[in-house]
Amino acid sequence: MSKVIIIGGGAAGMFAALGAVDAGHQVTILEQNEKLGKKIYITGKGRCNLTNACETSEIFENIPRNAKFLYSAIYGYDNFRVIDFFEEHGMPTKTERGNRVFPVSDHSSDVIATLQRTLKNKGVTVRLHTKAEHLEIEEGKVRGVKTSNGTTYPADAVIIATGGYSYQTTGSTGDGYRFAKKSGHTIAPLSPSLVPMTVKEDYCMPVSYTHLRAHETLSDL
């Protein structure tokens, strides 16, 4: 049984852990925060809009750039499989305006609880307050992960699931890019995806992260 270390215990890290353990591996999640899924708690205004019930092909129509890059990932585990996963593990869902899918309870904590319970039932080891510091690489292969407290976790494979740079207060500080670069990967230039817009002026910075329902009108010029 090979050992798989997953750096990061967010949504991607937890689902990666479930996939790895189902494939017969011994899995450990290293999470620097005090709990798993910290960013999940704040998604969908605390309700967790966990996926969309539209046809899978429609998802790509709403990705602003390089949608083809996501083809294999999304078709490999599409939005309907996500819904089925939570339903099968005891968390009913509902679909609202715009085909947005939420837990019936309207609590993002139920999404996390479902994932945590499934991880525990499948025997995944979780190490909280454990910050990955760097990868142990020998002869071009990753052999383990060294943490900030000096502990080294040996591994046959390492999955980087640290998130990007957004909402750094949740722990997304870009460590994954550093790990990937050290292991030989090339890092492409980063740019926003949710709102792919660059603004020259700085007067709009105070309204960053402000949500509102907007309307626009075009007149005959």
Residue ranges and their predicted role:
Residues 4-28:
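N-terminal Rossmann-like FAD-binding beta1-loop-alpha1 element of flavoenzymes
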Residues 22-40:
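Glycine-rich FAD pyrophosphate-binding loop
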Residues 128-141:
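A conserved short coil-to-beta-strand element within the FAD-binding core of flavoproteins
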Residues 153-165:
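Short hydrophobic core segments
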Residues 211-221:
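Single conserved hydrophobic/aromatic residue that forms the stacking wall/gate
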